[in-house]
């Protein structure tokens, strides 16, 4: 075998898997406690002496991630043709179960794994603690429930599953892809804490297709927003899968109860995803879009979204307030303004540099011009939506000290900067932006106050939250709870005003009904769009040269055949510096398509 598992160990695995099934059947057939009692010793499953290198390619054959360079103990137990092990992480180290303190016992419809004591240093040292896992057989798979206790805060608990079949992989409802011999890491939400390391999950579910009619779903049944990661390490005959639950960073939990992980087998991709999306719908209380009260009547009639690009990071102005009003007047000749939402991107000055001031900009035309843009636009029926950075603030702005305590720290304590953009094109990513947490009152009060003033002072119809889906597990407070609090308080004060987010993760569908990214992958679209609607991202190439406007992407290719429209999103038209003067014919064609789709 490629993993060089010994014949003796392999026979242990096969024997334990078969024995568990026989014992469960015999116990059920006996029907009484007396009949089952003599089989108590036999009902104990064997502890399999597996390690981190068991049943995986060593060395890796494709893309790989960091891993231990020795055989880290992963003692496991066979159940339902799979093998299960667990690792507990404190804030200082990784801890394996001590095999000498483990006991695995058949239970009605499942197996209980109990461990007294952990090991560290690759098994060379011991540490106090306990772990109890309950494996439950379901109609089509296995549920995994784990509780770990230590004498220090538990950071993370990983459930390890071996025997998962190789095949094409899909996540969060996306298309199935052949990942070959590559290792795969997926993270929920926002990459599970490392944006550019893991593939992103909008909801914690993945599916493996091993044959035309064979699908295995792995999902978390959590009802709170908490970090999940899934790591797939291939071997010759299957995957070793690590199911990682990271506890709330703002809590010190010496006992961590892991929400249920579910493994299920189905025959179609639709069935593979159906149960998970039904779970999150009920767990997070998603309202149906058709009846949800936070959708204003005008949004239900919106046939077109205009992205009006304002001022670039460098200060370059694509369209000032007066130019934007001129654009609206022309658009109103092509489609009734009351059917259009105007998205004001970077209306407040230099894109991101002037975050988080959110004040009308003099170079863009000042107060009078902005007020005219809003009021005159609304007279034509347009709805006006300015953009706000939900979790971004420039540390060099004068008011930084008042909100500095809200900068995000990951669960391990490292400060988070929004440092993944080269704003000035010096071929180096800038680091002057702090990544902010709405769960901290200072930041939430500041941002909520700026949005409230724009609504009160200028009467805007909606507000847009940039990077809305960027939840990170902070050490101070829950970003999700903070966002929900802010949105709900603004809605209570301004019930007619719409909240819109850039992108979503599952739980956000409860309180934000509109987004401009992530309209739903192939197998998720129907579920997601039952609760929310979407329009195209502001970085979508504009007609002509394909400029991304204020966004850092630069240029893309504008598709003259599709006009950058898709069936999953409200038709969207980007206006950059040359769109109105040089690309008006194409802009008119986009508007015509929007009218046709809406039956106007």
Predicted regions and their residues:
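N-terminal secretory signal peptides and thylakoid transit peptides that target proteins
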Residues: 2-18
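C-terminal segment of N-terminal export signals and the immediately downstream linker at the start
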Residues: 3-5, 24-49
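Carbohydrate-recognition beta-sandwich/jelly-roll modules
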Residues: 47-341, 376, 383
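Active-site-proximal substrate-binding groove within the catalytic cores of carbohydrate-active enzymes
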Residues: 253-254, 258-259, 305-306, 313, ...
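The substrate-binding groove and active-site-proximal loops of carbohydrate-active enzymes
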Residues: 307-322, 354-367, 429-445, 468-478
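Aromatic- and glycine-enriched glycan-recognition loops and surfaces
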Residues: 309-404
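Active-site groove signature of glycoside hydrolases
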Residues: 343-346, 447-475
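Active-site-adjacent "subsite" loops/lids of carbohydrate-active enzymes
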Residues: 390-453
């Amino acid at each position: 075998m490629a993993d060089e598992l010994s014949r003796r160990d392999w026979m242990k695995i096969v024997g334990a898997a078969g024995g568990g099934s026989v014992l469960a059947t015999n116990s059920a057939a006996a029907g009484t406690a007396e009949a089952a009692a003599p089989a108590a010793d036999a009902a104990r499953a064997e502890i399999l002496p597996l390690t981190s290198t068991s049943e995986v390619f060593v060395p890796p054959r494709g893309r790989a991630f960091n891993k231990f360079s020795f055989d880290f103990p992963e003692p496991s137990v066979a159940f339902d043709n799979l093998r299960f092990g667990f690792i507990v992480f404190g804030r200082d180290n990784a801890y394996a179960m001590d095999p000498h303190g483990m006991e695995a016992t058949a239970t009605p419809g499942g197996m209980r794994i109990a461990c007294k004591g952990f090991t560290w240093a690759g098994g060379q040292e011991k540490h106090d603690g306990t772990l109890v896992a309950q494996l439950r057989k379901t109609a089509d798979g296995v549920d995994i429930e784990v509780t770990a206790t230590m004498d220090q805060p538990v950071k993370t608990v990983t459930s390890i599953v071996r025997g998962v079949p190789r095949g094409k992989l899909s996540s969060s409802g996306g298309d199935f892809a052949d990942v070959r011999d590559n290792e795969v890491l997926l993270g929920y939400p926002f990459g599970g804490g490392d944006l550019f390391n893991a593939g992103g999950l909008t909801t914690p579910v993945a599916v493996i297709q091993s044959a035309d009619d064979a699908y295995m779903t792995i999902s978390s049944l959590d009802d709170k927003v908490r970090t999940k990661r899934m790591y797939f390490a291939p071997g010759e005959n299957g995957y070793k899968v690590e199911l990682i639950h990271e506890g709330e960073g703002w809590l010190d939990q010496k006992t961590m109860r892991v929400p249920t992980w579910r493994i299920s087998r189905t025959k179609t991709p639709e069935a593979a995803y159906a149960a998970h999306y039904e779970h999150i719908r009920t767990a997070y209380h998603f309202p149906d879009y058709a009846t949800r009260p936070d959708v204003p009547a005008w949004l239900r009639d919106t046939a077109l979204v205009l992205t009006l690009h304002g001022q670039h990071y460098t200060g370059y102005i694509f369209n000032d307030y007066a130019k934007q009003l001129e654009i609206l007047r022309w658009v109103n000749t092509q489609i009734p303004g009351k059917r259009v939402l105007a998205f004001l991107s970077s209306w407040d000055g230099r894109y991101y540099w002037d975050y988080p001031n959110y004040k009308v900009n003099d170079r863009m035309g000042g107060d009078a011009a902005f007020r005219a843009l809003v009021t005159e636009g609304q007279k034509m029926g347009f709805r006006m939506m300015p953009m706000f950075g939900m979790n971004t603030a420039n540390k060099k702005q004068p008011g930084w000290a008042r909100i500095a305590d809200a900068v995000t720290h990951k669960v391990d304590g490292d400060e988070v900067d929004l440092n993944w953009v080269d704003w000035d094109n010096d071929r180096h990513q800038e680091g002057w932006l702090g990544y902010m947490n709405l769960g901290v009152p200072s930041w939430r009060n500041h941002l909520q106050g700026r949005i409230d003033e724009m609504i009160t002072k200028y009467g805007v119809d909606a507000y847009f939250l940039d990077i809305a889906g960027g939840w990170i597990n902070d050490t101070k407070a829950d970003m999700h709870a903070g966002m929900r609090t802010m949105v709900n308080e603004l809605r209570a004060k301004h019930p007619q005003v719409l909240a819109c987010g850039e992108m979503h993760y599952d739980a956000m569908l409860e309180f934000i009904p509109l987004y401009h990214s992530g309209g739903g992958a192939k197998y998720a679209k129907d579920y997601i769009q039952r609760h929310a609607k979407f329009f195209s991202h502001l970085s979508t190439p504009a007609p002509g040269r394909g400029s991304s406007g204020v966004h850092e992407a630069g240029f893309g290719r504008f598709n003259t055949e599709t006009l950058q429209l898709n069936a999953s999103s409200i038709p969207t038209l980007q206006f950059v510096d040359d769109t109105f003067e040089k690309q008006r014919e194409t802009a008119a064609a986009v508007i015509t398509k929007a009218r046709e789709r809406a039956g106007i």
